[in-house]
Amino acid sequence: AANGTEMFKGKQVAGLQGLATLYPETVQIVTLKKSGIKSVADFKGKRIAVGAAGSGTEANARQIMEAYGIKYDDIKVQYLSFGEAASALKDGNVDAAFVTAGHPTAAIQDIATQNDVVLVPVDADKADALIKQYPFYTKLVIKAGTYPKQDADVSAVAVKCMLAVTDKMDENTAYAIAKALYGNLDRMKSAHSAANAISKATAKDGMSIKLNPGAEKFFNEK
């Protein structure tokens, strides 16, 4: 949005500033064991669900595949939402699917209850290249046991859910919001498990736009 790229091409949002990054939305690459797919490098010629056309998931899929030298011309592209991709994977109509969401993800858990699901890793060198080009990505590990029959950790990348404001927000208001947010994490954690990943220590991870001065002041306090 700040740079006017991807789904914001021609619709750049001026004056965006960050308040904080919150929890990771993991780019999960899902296939079934019977597909034989073990790496993104195996995608050539395969039917790949990349998310709904123009969605954030689709941008993630394209960017990750490009890190492996794979373009849309190399695969059979399927523009499917989370639910559609899950159904297509179960029915054998796609070979792999990208799902960008906090994990564990219900749609993937649903597939895993009746199928041998495999999470395709993002290799460390590819993740590094991706982060260098797109600094809003962060590295992440999907721990063993997150999904049924997942017996090993899987390396992945994530985009951080971000609170963004405009430069019209004054410093004092931004400071107050940040203080209220991080001063009430216990209440947030009791309301939703995703809040367990929110911390002051990681609030600037994956921050790809200028941080509001008021938020900066709060995070710099001891």
What are these regions (language model features)?
Residues 1-44, 49-52:
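Short, glycine-/small- and polar/acidic-enriched structural segments
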Residues 16-22, 76, 109-155:
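Short beta-strand->loop
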